[in-house]
């Protein structure tokens, strides 16, 4: 049986053979059908993953299990005050359980990954949430070339617009600064994020995490120097020999920018 609309919400990216199942679901669509999915985005989750890393690293330094009652208390001291300011639909406990310490949160995708898969199935990206592709608003309909309707051409436009808006996804709101990273730089950024996310598997917590040039560049050249300073400071603190949780908590909660970032 074929369907006009298929909704696959919040699970595809967690599957071991996710590319296979993505294509399998598409095979159940009627011509012109819509597939609606959501997923954990590797770039959009940057600061959410940083929160997890801060928690895991703080707990590791003090031989505390992140999923224990003590781990929850540390998370509350770090994040609860700002969490309570959000327009939210779940409790802090649920967020801690579902996101901060959940290993499935590290099973990420990106729009790039999905576009590559869509191209192999002649599928085009129709829309996103949030909406960031405004390129079509600037073109007179009589000037549209049939080639513009080619799925790969449509998808490439989405990718180009997505790259320009990358900082907005990182920070969680529109900062009005377009950026265009190369594929190599995007890969380096993803590499850093995935290194942080090894903490979900209790790996690499005994090692210092190195900030690569791309991560530095993103913060330095895009009117984000205050974000950069606080980010570098917290990483330096986590990389240090201190096991003083209160010192880490104090720096994070007193930060101006860092504590207000969400995935």
Provide a role label for each language-model segment.
Residues 14-15, 43-47, 133-140:
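Short catalytic/ligand-binding loop motif for oxyanion handling, primarily in non-cytosolic enzymes
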Residues 19-34:
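A short glycine-rich, Lys/Arg-flanked "PGG" loop and its adjoining helix->strand segment in the class I
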Residues 78-90:
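Short acidic N-proximal helix/loop "leader" segments that mark the beginning
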Residues 34-81:
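Conserved class I S-adenosyl-L-methionine
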Residues 13-14, 28:
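A short His-aromatic
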Residues 8-11:
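A short beta-strand submotif of the Rossmann-like class I SAM-dependent methyltransferase core
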Residues 1-6:
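A short acidic, Gly/Pro-enriched loop at the edge of an enzyme's catalytic core
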Residues 87-263:
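Rossmann-like AdoMet/SAM-dependent catalytic core
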